[in-house]
Amino acid sequence: MDIVEEKLPIGPEEVAEAAAVLQKYKAGKAALDKRLVDNELWFRMGHWKNYQNPMMEGKPQPSSGWLFNSIANKHADAMDNYPAPNVLPRAADDEQTARVLSSILPVVLEQADYEQVYSDTWWRKLKQGTGVKGVFWDPEAHGGLGEIAIRPMNLLMLYWEPGVEDIQTSPNFFSLRMENTRQLETRWPQLKGHSASVLDVPRFLHDGGLDTTEKSVVVDWYYKKPDAEGRVLLHYCKFCNGVVLYASENDPALAGRGFYDHGKYPFVFDPLFMEEDSPAGFGYIDVMKECQTAIDRMNHAMDENVLLASKQRYVLSDTAGVNEEELADLSRDIVHVVGRLGDDSFRPLQTAGLQGNSLSYRNSRIEELKAISGNRDMTQGGTAGGVTAASAIAALQEAGSKLSRDMLKSAYRAFARECYLILDLMRQFYDEERVFRIVGAAGQNEFVPFSGAALRPQPAGTVGGVELGSREPVFDIVVSAEKKSTFSRLSQNETAKECYQLGFFAPANADAALAALEMMDFEGIEKVRQRVRQNGTLAMQLAVLQSRLTAQEQPGKAAVTGPADNLSTKAAADAMGLGKENR
């Protein structure tokens, strides 16, 4: 009796259909792919390779670094404001869990080498107009225990349905990468005999070329599919050269659950300047190309002019009788001539030097490029004439950095979405308790245990013998800058010194200081208010102690005149009930 194999949900036919959808997505993204390749050349100052300019043919192709300098400064601003997450609970019952998450999330990010991911993504965001990060679960990490992995993604190798603004609304999402065919066959034996690559992917241009003859395109296919109950599940399939390597629908443990419980594509897009009907945006290179091209052409013409003006050339008649080889050889002191020379047959050829208006025009185009990119001299530490006061320079730098602050806000919003994905992966995969080393409030190392059970639905209790079901903890992510720029630190320190000099922290001035703080706004103001309130409360308690001690004094002894001057620390602590705690 023949055994009929059960047909798997995902097989060669489904993969062929997915490949056809991928080709359609590639056609809709062709213009964006061409722009990405072109922008990479611009960033490497090799953009003349894409232009067949008759003026440049056979001549040096100068590429000044004004565009590169603008992008490098934007990247430096981003690294000066490296983000840090703060988890806030939406219910009082989850406050302790939120406090623990605020401590361990930076550790998870550090273990995932997030600072390098953050840097690489910012380079791509500035060059290509969009930074993309992938938040995945790596089941092979830590010897099979598994861990969260965050990777910078190459926008050139990502595909979605044309016309959507949010990738989560795309029915399919494809992530491609090139891998060595032999290594793939070793890991997945079913690939043997299918080494011919059936997909072509766009690639960046390299000076030495890129040999892809021994590589195959591996496709990570994510798609959303409703189940019998109407829930939309996220499924995942990895295939190469038409062969299924893994499919979550073929996995009995995930077929009815989905690959990730959060049901979202594990990619976060962060566009620099948004475009309609696309999750990808455009970057600074796209808006600075024309100006940089004009500067390069003027530099080329000016370089040619300087070389011609500095080199002596001559106009010779055929009847001049001058030995041209001896004339061109600058080491010869004597040049032989046949016959007589005259101005009509031999004269120097003069080349006009650069005009002042030409230099002024080129400088104006350079200033235009700086203005377009928001990369004024003041943002790099330079100042205008007559500005010497430190406060004035700081004010100019702060006013000139508003474009950087705007970019950082969009990056922080993307970072918050990444943190939400991390929490969802913790909820799904942190089955075993893990121990994280954190820095405590006093600066000492603490070891905090944590598992996904703290994030999963908790019993809501009973009322009148009726169970209220379960409640899943929900949190909010607030992002702040962990690494601040030198100016931000100096500004914060100056604010603290001014508050101290004005007597904000004097206990007797607590009420007036709180009134002033109500009209102020700066980072960390809540901590300052809390400290001022504590100082005011301490002053009131000391005043009450003073009155009590004065009333109990024996006649003839001097009265205590000050709340903090004549009252000993021990007596104050004992009277306030702190003595027992300190023993």
Please provide the spans of the model-predicted regions.
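Extended, helix-rich architectural segments
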Residues: 1-256, 319, 353, 357, ...
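C-terminal anchoring/interaction modules
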Residues: 1-59, 125, 133, 139-143, ...
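A broad, low-specificity signal for short, low-complexity segments enriched in glycine/proline
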Residues: 91-98, 195-199, 256-258, 273-277, ...
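A short, structural micro-pattern
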Residues: 127, 152, 213-215, 230-232, ...
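Hydrophobic/aromatic interaction determinants used to assemble and anchor large protein complexes
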Residues: 248, 253, 258-267, 280
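Acidic/polar low-complexity segments with low predicted structural confidence
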Residues: 280, 284-288
